[in-house]
Amino acid sequence: MMKLYSLVIIATLAAAAFAATSEEISAAVGEIISQHQEDLERYAKVVERGEEPKKYIRCSKQLGESCYLNCECCGAAAVCEDYKYICKEKVSDNSVLNALGQAWNAVGNSISRYYCDAE
């Protein structure tokens, strides 16, 4: 499975290098990183307050449903949108950047899934 993720990331980066400008790539990567950083920050605030963290169930929300953490959203590339807090997959209107973003989301989701409990 890890080889598949690596292959997807390498292929997407190669395609993005030819199809998109460095500014577009930087903006898309920055947005994706900030989404996963917010998961860490939200979880850290709960722990800092000494509260018992809410039990988030992995893959308990479908695309378009309300969410709080990325790991709640079903789909390898699905993330919890920052502003509306709904599950989404689309990253960019540019198809190459969207593929790059979805690959990056899949990698980030493999890490953030540890914040959610399996059902």
Swiss-Prot record:
One of its GO terms (molecular function) is toxin activity. The keyword Signal applies. Disulfide bonds join 59-74, 67-80, 71-116, 73-87. It comes from the Eukaryota. Its main location: secreted. GO terms for cellular component: extracellular region. Ion channel inhibitor. The presence of a 'disulfide through disulfide knot' structurally defines this protein as a knottin. This is Toxin ICK-11. It comes from Trittame loki (Brush-footed trapdoor spider).
